[in-house]
């Protein structure tokens, strides 16, 4: 299997497909399946799946097992199965992920083989749909990010965006209509073998314990292909909003997370009504409690979006003039999640034998990631709070390790020690 320069070859393939799709929005692609089992595409798919890590699926075969078998041999077997039409996906292994509120979120884990085939399929079909996706969509797309979505929201709120429709699509991934999804996919793809793959992944079933469940609704949250399928499905919302909703407000969508920034309450009510109408066309519903219209006018209310809380607050210019500005800072849920992660990585019972340097080494990448995402010019207070929490957590660890009765004694000593040993700070100051 030739794998040299696979990344560049894949980039050229995707660019060609994108430009072809962009030239004609009615063109349907009939020869995509052979791209899925190309050597360079399969190898690039493997590299991406490996980089994403993740545990094994129902077959128990993990990344390390495949490396022991031999990557080239394993990919050649997948290629043969695809070429001969013998590939059949396995059920998705379901695990329950704890949420901050105490409830659980189901997550589907496909086998590594299925993840590779899904990634290869995504490489082949994503450029075609990218040509149709709208500017208001930011989630799980090339060269687009949550930070970009947050910046659009911030600017829209500052530009007389006094009312916000904070929308929550009820159990989106569980309620995607598979037949409608296939019809939307068929608008751009006529290759029956690609469509068969997408359908197979939808009906392969979910294994939870020893119980196999096959549903006619939904797409597995956690699979490689599901974010792209979500964007294909919700592109209908984006297109209809572009056609009918721009006079009501600015739609910003990140996968199924959606907000609409409006200039007055009347527009917000119209926006919500239109959104409910579009959801009905997609066989989806807005959560009756979580979906709400938020007044940003006086700063008494705010909303959460992509881990950030948004609220208009009074600030002061260098000349002492007061004005309102939209502040973005970590939501309560995000703060709670970060603090739990800090505690897990520093103050766990099994970590009492660890060296301080090792704890710092493990925590620093997380701090850098959080800082890159959450740090803004308006949220220094929250970053300082997290820095103090980290200091306190290290202090508790230090005192437990040295069997001191007072958990917060020697806090100054610990603070100096961890920063001297290279601990990163969340705050800029």
Spans of features found by a protein language model:
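A glycine-rich phosphate-binding loop feature that marks nucleotide/adenosyl-phosphate handling sites
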Residues: 254-255, 291-298, 359-363, 383-391, ...
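A conserved non-catalytic segment of reverse transcriptases
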Residues: 203, 282, 286-354
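Non-catalytic, polymerase-adjacent accessory regions of viral genome-replication enzymes
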Residues: 1-67, 72
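Duplex nucleic acid-engaging cores and interfaces of nucleic-acid transaction enzymes
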Residues: 113-120, 182
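A terminal-accessory region detector
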Residues: 380-429
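Core structural elements
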Residues: 37-42, 91-92, 100, 202, ...
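Short, solvent-exposed helix-loop connector elements
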Residues: 214-219, 327, 343-358, 369-382, ...
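Conserved polymerase palm-domain catalytic core
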Residues: 74-77, 81-96, 100, 132-297, ...
